[in-house]
Amino acid sequence: MNVTARSDMPSLILPGGESIPRLGLGTWRMGEARSTRAQEVAVLRHAFAAGITLIDTAEMYGEGGAEEVLGEALRGSGVVRERLFIVSKVYPWNASREGTVAACERA
């Protein structure tokens, strides 16, 4: 799936010239229960199909479960990962330079 942001989606131009959508989908509460995983994957894939290219997640959402759901939604979806903006956050105890890099690599 070749995901592109909708042309009518409000966007913000970053200093590097990239256009990032002002509207995205948050994944808080995703990945907390196996019983809702299929529905969560479906929601993310529906968002991709609707042109949503900004996904917000964090290592503390479902203790990493939200990131796993996002990964599952991407696998087999045909979405080109490089077309997405994935915004994440780290635990305060991982907020050092090294901790942040390590948290991103785990994601």
Language-model-detected regions and their locations in the chain:
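N-terminal binding-site loop/beta-alpha segment at the start of enzyme catalytic domains
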Residues: M1-L84
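A short, structured active-site edge motif that brings together acidic residues
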Residues: E82-N94
